[in-house]
């Protein structure tokens, strides 16, 4: 899947991902009104508004961009109807040949981690049959629990030709409370970056690994260091725009 992402970035000349993080207050009134007229002011009505809003964004961008990134919490808050909207969004984006990055930030161990990986990237066994569920192409994951939390995802990625973006240095202001803590004279995020690079070396596409990293745009100097630490890992860079990241600040995150 990393090869497809690289190819689509080159084809579109757009190293960007469109976040599909719908908030009801941002959805145009005519979309919300139509959904509420049909389903009422219900969870189903909210989910329909979200789905139609996402569909409009995808229809107007799919030939300009390589990927979309739906944030699952924005859907989960509306319960099962919200997750239906998430599922419809993922499937529609894939119909349009977009790469889908599920921004799910899962982090657990053992069978629980394996279940998360199966639900988002793999296939679940039901009797003699297997079923794909949300079926995103990539997922974001939290490495705080170590290899026990990451390996089940890597196993599914290898089997299903999928990929990961592992949180290394996040864009939020308080990320330094833990991520910048020094261990043997080096910040924790560098140690995490080294581990991502090691995992990545063992799981390569043509030129880059399908084990990528999340490094916030709000910390370009740290991004510069981490680019060198993880030369073969694609970096997902949140925080551009509203959070303060700038175009000039993004340069260190690129190899070329």
Residue ranges and their predicted role:
Residues 64-66, 70-132, 222:
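N-terminal active-site wall of soluble small-molecule enzyme domains
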């Amino acid at each position: 899947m990393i090869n497809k992402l690289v190819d689509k970035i080159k084809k579109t000349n757009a190293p960007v991902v469109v976040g599909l993080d719908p908030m009801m207050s941002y959805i145009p009134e005519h979309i919300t009104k139509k959904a509420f007229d049909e389903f009422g002011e219900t969870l189903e009505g909210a989910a329909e508004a979200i789905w139609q809003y996402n569909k409009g964004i995808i229809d107007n961008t799919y030939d300009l961009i390589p990927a979309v990134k739906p944030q699952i919490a924005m859907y989960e808050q509306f319960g099962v109807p919200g997750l239906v909207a998430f599922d419809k969004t993922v499937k529609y984006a894939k119909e349009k040949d977009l790469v889908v990055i599920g921004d799910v930030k899962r982090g657990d161990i053992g069978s629980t981690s394996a279940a998360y990986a199966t639900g988002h990237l793999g296939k679940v066994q039901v009797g003699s049959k297997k079923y794909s569920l949300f079926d995103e192409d990539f997922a974001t994951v939290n490495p705080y629990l170590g290899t026990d939390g990451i390996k089940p995802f890597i196993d599914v990625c290898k089997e299903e030709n999928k990929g990961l973006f592992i949180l290394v240095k996040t864009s939020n202001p308080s990320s330094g409370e833990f991520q910048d803590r020094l261990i043997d004279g080096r910040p924790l995020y560098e140690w995490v970056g080294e581990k991502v690079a090691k995992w990545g070396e063992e799981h390569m596409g043509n030129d880059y690994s399908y084990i990528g990293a999340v490094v916030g745009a709000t910390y370009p100097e740290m991004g510069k260091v981490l680019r060198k630490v993880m030369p073969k890992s694609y970096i997902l860079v949140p925080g551009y725009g509203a959070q303060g990241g700038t175009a000039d600040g993004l340069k260190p995150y690129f190899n070329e």
